[in-house]
Amino acid sequence: MRDAYGREIDYLRVSVTDRCNLRCRYCMPEDGIPLLAHEDILSFEQIEAVVRTAARMGFRKVRLTGGEPLARRGVSDLVAMLGRVRGIETLAMTTNGTMLAPLAAALAAGGLDSVNISLDTLDPARYRYLTRRGDIADALEGVDAAIAAGLAVKLNMVVMEDTADAEIAAMRDFAAGKGIALQTISRYSLQAQKGDSAEYDRPPPCSACNRIRLLANGVLRSCLHSDIDMKVDFSDIEGSIAAAVRSKPVHGAVSSTKSVGQIGG
């Protein structure tokens, strides 16, 4: 469906949990963020209902995010549910990969098409520093398992102020050797004084934005930087989605106080 500015909105990002097993320095504080109560998090059946309705309205792509989506117990069951939704052409996931290895085959069998794996360095010590608690061996095992399962794999590398050119070159060589894609993303603050660098890949400009977000608590967010949140009315899901699309601004705010961990992936 089209928004008020003529953009075709056909991409739904679904945060299945606000929990994460890592504490990446650019994403959330070391002590984490205030977590939702379990009873406030959407059930798989509720997520499926929203996705089915979105598909009937013309949405064609769904991406599961978090938090860390694989931290949600039984997420492979959710993938299988969504994999059966008629009209959804692409079912994807963004993950840190550390819990992916034992689940990759089941996720692919359930209908997952692709994974974006966050991997900012190949150096074990730096990986531990950046994630505060992660083991790079787990992430690399996840990459290999995803490839073996037949999933399309893309690495997301956040390039920070102290990232050496040699690290970027090493990651490019690693991705090329695995036959997978690499996207480098400039570390961006949501504050105006630190914008993305044009040297690296960037999110699509507002004029080409085709997505809305469903947060883990059932809130629909039409824009990454938006302060307008709409709770899904499960007696009128179509109306809720339509209202979120209509509320999508022509462009996002110049700055925001939200952290990366608070914007639903």
Q: Can you describe what each PLM-predicted range is?
A:
Residues 1-13, 23-25, 56, 250-265:
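N-terminal [4Fe-4S]-dependent radical SAM core
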Residues 4-42:
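Canonical Radical SAM [4Fe-4S] cluster-binding loop centered on the CxxxCxxC motif
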Residues 16, 20, 24, 64, ...:
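Conserved, mostly hydrophobic/aromatic
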Residues 25-28, 104-105, 127-128, 225, ...:
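A short local structural element in Rossmann-fold oxidoreductases
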Residues 29, 52, 80, 84, ...:
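Short, well-ordered alpha-helices that flank and scaffold nucleotide-derived cofactor binding pockets
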Residues 41-64, 68-168:
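Radical SAM/AdoMet-radical enzyme domain recognition
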Residues 120, 125-217, 231:
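Radical SAM enzyme [4Fe-4S]-AdoMet core and its adjacent flexible, acidic
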Residues 188-265:
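Accessory C-terminal segments flanking Radical SAM cores
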